[in-house]
């Protein structure tokens, strides 16, 4: 199997993890990283010994040696424009959630990937947890029988809430529950949603982070 040259745009919390994992992966030949904070760029470069480290993500997009890009930037409003440039540059792309803030932008990115014949996926990490994959296997082989309903509840700590809120106005579904929705739909494929009802509560977090406290969603498949 050919080894890949990978570029990572954004090496903060999640991007830093991906950079370290890529540096240790035998399938990765060259690692290129980009981070707008010089101190963090140096910190991650010291940990990963990349082929190149830059403050400007466009340096990675112009590098013909790079096959694939991972985008892990904040605020989340940066996902769409950087992803668009990446796909237009003909690079394979792993983009952290959310894919974008509007359906129109999401459809455009998918269309660009298809047009340029490149792989494009969202970083839904739950699929790679062994216990989650095991449950899906039991859906597929019939051990669990015909699914009637799926109930998922996700709670996050106050510390994590402070870390991820306030950057962009997004619902709890877009920020966190998207992982659970992806997992449920992965298990239930090829079934598709046909109707959705959702409601959220805004009392505490809205004062400082412009985010809702909780969200309830009912999805008919």
Task: Write out the residue ranges for each language-model feature.
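Beta-loop-alpha module in the N-terminal Rossmann-like domain of NAD(P)-dependent dehydrogenases
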Residues: 51-112
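Local beta-strand N-terminus motif with an aromatic residue
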Residues: 30, 50, 66-69, 144-147, ...
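Rossmann-like dinucleotide-binding domain that binds NAD(P)(H)
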Residues: 160-218
């Amino acid at each position: 199997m050919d080894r890949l040259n990978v570029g990572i745009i954004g090496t903060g919390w999640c991007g830093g993890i991906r950079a370290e994992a890529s540096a240790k992966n035998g399938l990765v030949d060259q690692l290129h990283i980009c981070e707008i904070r010089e101190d963090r760029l140096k910190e991650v470069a010291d940990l990963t010994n990349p082929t190149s480290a830059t403050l400007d993500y466009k340096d990675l997009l112009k590098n013909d040696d790079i096959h694939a890009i991972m985008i892990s930037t904040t605020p989340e409003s940066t996902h769409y424009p950087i992803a668009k440039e990446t796909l237009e540059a003909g690079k394979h792309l792993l983009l952290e959630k959310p894919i974008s803030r509007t359906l129109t932008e999401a459809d455009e990115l998918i269309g660009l990937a298809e047009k340029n014949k490149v792989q494009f996926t969202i970083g839904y990490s739950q699929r790679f947890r062994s216990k989650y994959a095991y449950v899906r296997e039991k859906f597929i082989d019939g051990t669990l029988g015909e699914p009637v309903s799926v109930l998922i509840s996700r709670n996050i700590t106050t510390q994590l809430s402070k870390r991820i809120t306030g950057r962009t106005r997004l619902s709890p579904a877009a920020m966190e529950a998207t992982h659970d929705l992806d997992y449920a739909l992965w298990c239930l494929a090829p079934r598709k949603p046909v109707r959705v009802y959702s409601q959220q509560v805004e009392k505490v977090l809205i004062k400082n982070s412009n985010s809702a406290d909780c969200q309830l969603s009912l999805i008919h498949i």
